[in-house]
Amino acid sequence: VTVLALDIGGTKFAAAAVTADGDVTARAEVPLSRAGSPDRALAQVVEQVTARVPADAIEGIGIGSAGPLDPRAGTVSPVNIPRWRDFPLTAAVGRMLPGRPVRLAGDAQCMALGEWWRGAFPEEPEKPGAAAPEPSAEAAAGPGEGPRRAGSRAVLGVVVSTGVGGGFVLDGVPYLGPTGNAGHIGHITVDPGGDPCPCGASGCVETVASGPAMVRWARAGGWTGADARALAASARAGSAIAQAAFRRAADALATAFHTAAALLDLDRVVVGGGVAAAGPILFDPLRQAMAENAGLGFTRRLRVDATSLGRDAGLLGAAALALPRRPPDTRPGAAPAVPE
């Protein structure tokens, strides 16, 4: 079984052919700055992949996109990509590869699902004699999006890049919400009097912790670099203002993560995206802020890790959306259905 996975981020459009074992057999990527119209960008990546994997071998299509999105209508409206607003993505893909099922979810939802399926979540041994918890209603009754990983029942995936997006995987099932937009953690308010956000609110996490927001703040303090990658390099070189920008972003992210953990009893947060590629410059102050601000006891067990799959996490999660499922096992303690 081979499926086509599509991943639309703030700066690039990626595609891959992925097998049921999670092997990537072909891939393509187009920078959105040079991609032209959405239809042209889609055509470029699909044509590059199908030049290496015959189109008739592709049995389904999974898409992860920056949001908001409308899975029922098949449209995407990424906040930071104006030309993609209300673009009928699933219909456009369906015209290129007719007759295949198409599934759409948020890019961070797919990243979390990809990590759950093929990533390196630390596994925690069960306590001796402990009974396995019953699966959630979604895991027992739903179609079974994604496999379960021991020790990580409730995962938040976060993409920190041009924007800040999020998505939940609970008991192996992406929780999408009634409109498909659950997990927009970048639009939790962390500073009510803060900068206006493109979403229409003010003081969102995204206005503090996204790459462009960090760069704007540092420049206001006298830094003269070009972008978030240069900001990370300056922080590593000892620039006080660059380091402060990362600490400020880390504080905002820690507040948002603790908020989500208090609501959903999370045990893992997996962070990816261009800003997360800064490594310890971001994760050291983030983990410090998490430790200093933990409140309720159960939130102190929350673990924050960088994605182990890098840029492939979103593609693998999108593939998992499209792969065939085994029927769910509804016995107590059974894992939800997984890709065959």
Model-found features: residue ranges?
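A charged helix-plus-loop insertion that forms the helical arch/lid used to bind
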Residues: 74-86
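Short beta-strand segments
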Residues: 7, 62-66, 105, 156-163, ...
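ATP-binding/phosphotransfer module of carbohydrate and carboxylate kinases, centering on a glycine-rich
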Residues: 1-60, 70-73, 91-101, 117-152, ...
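Short acidic, glycine/serine/threonine-rich loops at helix termini
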Residues: 115-117, 169-170
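Residue-level detector of high-confidence beta-strand sites
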Residues: 27-29, 79, 113, 177
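Structural signature of FAD isoalloxazine-binding scaffolds in flavoprotein oxidoreductases
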Residues: 181-184
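Generic beta-strand structural signal
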Residues: 100, 153-158, 162-166, 170, ...
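Glycine/small-residue-rich loop that forms an oxyanion/phosphate-binding "nest" at active or ligand-binding sites
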Residues: 103, 109, 113-115
